[in-house]
Amino acid sequence: MSNEQGKGMGFFGNKGKPASEKKDEKKTKLDLDYKPDLNPSTPYDPTLPVKATLVNGDKRGTLRIPLETKHEFDALLEISEYQYTYELLGEMLDTWMKKLTPEQLRLFHASLENIKRKAAIKEAKKKK
């Protein structure tokens, strides 16, 4: 190897070059000096109204039904006047409720209150 080639060699070929000519060297240094805290452009104003939040956004339940039943329900939803699942389900419940006898209706309401009470207890345990 000739002497001229040897001079150019080095770690990434930067050996012997002035600092300004070296590859991959940043020209700007990281500024680590202390700077005072920035003031917010719009400070907190407690008089401003709170942005609207979704009411009962997390008050949802899941129904686990067989896939075939789900497909049938989706087909009913498509041909019905309703756009959302809960609307069609509400209509189906209403139709069923009209068929109940007074005794069955009383049992339904008792069962509903029991289920709501258990759900409230479960929710209270989650919040602790």
From Swiss-Prot:
Quote the biased-composition stretches of kind Basic and acidic residues, using this chain's numbering: 18-36
Name the UniProt key words of this record, in alphabetical order: Plasmid
Q: Which domain of life is it from?
A: Bacteria
- Annotated region Disordered: the residues are 1-50
> Mind telling me what this protein is named?
Uncharacterized protein pXO2-40/BXB0041/GBAA_pXO2_0041
